[in-house]
Amino acid sequence: MLLSVATATAYGLGVQSAPAEPAVSAPATSPAVKLTQAQIVERARAYMVQIGVDPDSENGRIIVAWFTRVAQNPDYLARLSSMRSLSADGSNMILPPAERLRFLRLMRDIANESGSGCEIPKVSGGNLASIAKTSSPKALRGTFELMDLIGERKGVSSGDDEHYTVAELLAVNARMDEIEVPPWLAKQSEPSTCALIRFAVDSLDKFPEPDQRRATYELFKLIAGGKSASETVLADPGAYLDDVFDDRRLPDAIRGQLPPDGSRPLPYARLSIDGEWVNKTTPRDSGPYVDTYVNRRNNGVVVELMTTKDASGNTNWASFGMGYGLTDLLDQTVRAPRYATPLRTLKTASAIVAANEPMTEGQRIEIALPQPSSHGQLTRRCDIGKTEPASTIFGTLTGNAVNLDCSEVRKDGTKTRVRSVWLADYGVELTRTIDDQDGRTDVVIKNVTVTQP
């Protein structure tokens, strides 16, 4: 929309030769218009008549006033036209934090003012005549204020000055995902862009710093066509696993309880499992997955990446984890297109001590879970069962498999039960069945690939 209006401005004032149809984009530069203010007003009014807008109507007067002001600012259109060449991540559109918040609030106001509101470009084809005829005066003023934030800015984009890690932006995504959706939005099966903007900006107004600054940065990337933090992670989940799920980044109280590097050797660098979930009660929970375990330092700590793909072969869900024995140290889930849970971290160092205890048949153990958990779970309770050869789980596995029957109780009282096996040779736990609110999910292992150190 910004470029359509910019083009119409240049054309209407005679700084472009008149095209048969309005141009798609503004000129690369905005030559100074050597006209008196009265001549500019005259041309602007004539242009209003040409596009079918009464120059004496309230919207006509708003546009004429804006035309007149812009024509006397030779850099204004050049800044707007620079928006044609957006960077891949949208950083060259990112305003300073206070102006980003002002921009988003204006978008919300425009959305609140009209049913089409922020979707005007789609509804009207983005041409100035349609915008002038369909917008309320308040919405039209808001539209020009939006353009002023871009056209009147000076200096480099804020995107050149602000640098956030993917983990920091993903944490903001997770915080936004935790906000309870209001009833007026929840009842919409496919919320409009305007509805989502209203909800997002109302939520952002309540964010403390630095989350508010990071959240507006993330939203501006999306507005400019860049990738969200969730999309960035799903495009290369292995990179995120390597960056964030590193035991050297654990809190000192937890890290200090772990064995030294090299003291707990495992016979692999990477263990990859191709499997399938089968749920006859809830078929949407069924499908193939890949579960990869990585042994980095032979200290008993194993990191895990489980992924699924969509019909196009793109990763659409990723579960990240770090464990030591039966104790989970870190975990996080990311789902397409823009969902993430907070990075959950073990807070109780005593859980490391429990992970060092031998597993004895008939024993019951209770292990603290990383927090904040997904549904208010605090601990996982496991009953230790019989030991059997690991080859009964999958033919190429070595050593023993200890059967486990574990459960977690959610805050609402519902329970998830997981039957699994502990593979002693590999230092990992493999799930066999899951019983939860969606019924029973059976896990079928299709293939196991071991990459040697």
Name each model-derived stretch.
Residues 144-174, 178, 354-411:
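Short helix-loop boundary/capping segments
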Residues 21-131, 235-310:
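N-terminal Sec/ER secretory leader and immediately downstream segment
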Residues 112-190:
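Extended amphipathic alpha-helical interaction segments
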Residues 231-331, 366-453:
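Acidic, serine/threonine-rich low-complexity disordered tracts
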Residues 8-25:
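Signal peptide processing junction and immediate N-terminal pro/mature segment
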Residues 1-8:
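Hydrophobic membrane-insertion alpha-helices, especially the h-region
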Residues 181-244:
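A cross-kingdom marker for long, charged
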Residues 118-121, 317-379:
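Extracellular-facing segments of soluble proteins and assemblies that are Gly/Ser/Thr-biased and enriched
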